[in-house]
Every structure is written in structure tokens, then in C-alpha cells.
Amino acid sequence: MHVISRKPFKDAAKKYPNDATAINQTYMVLRKGHFSSPAELRRLFPSLDNFKYKKKWWVIDIGGNNLRLLAFIEFRDNRMYVKHITTHAEYDKLCKKYMQAGD
């Protein structure tokens, strides 16, 4: 999958050093894989779920469910743009923000 930028992963690894290994592993798995559908990606990331407040945004749990990765994924083109890698508490705040903003 074409992960548009590694920067969100590097930033998250610095911000959450206890989960840096899991963050970097997630990046490598995503970058090396080819996923033409959510079902294919879900085989490697069973936690994959759609983010109901934005079209084509998806959520993946990272680091034993310590963090959440929010990304725009275009399966047709096999590309991903990571929007956020954050804790569950911050994820809850983002949900409220996007829910209020609408699509």
C-alpha cells in the first residue's frame, strides 16, 4: 500500500515511545502490503473499522489497543493518508469534533 507519508508514524513514535515498536511495525506492514479491500486489510488488522464521521476514513488499533490510527484509505488505488495516530482519549475528542463538523 502506498502510505503517503511516514511522518505521522515518526511523530507518534516520539510522542508515544512505549508503543514505538508497534507503530513502526504497523507502518512496515502497511507499506509492504497490497490491500484492494477492507476485508484484505482486516486479515492483518482485525480491529479495522470504518470511521463513521468521514467517508473513506478507517480506524486501526495499534500497540495492543493502546493507540488508534485514523486514515483516509482509497482501496481502489491502494493508497493511505494517515490523519492521526493518537490515544483512545484523544480519539474520543476527535470523534466529537468530526461528528459536530459533519462530512
Task: Tell me the role of every PLM-derived stretch.
Residues 1-66, 74-81, 88-103:
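Basic, Lys/Arg-enriched alpha-helical interface segments
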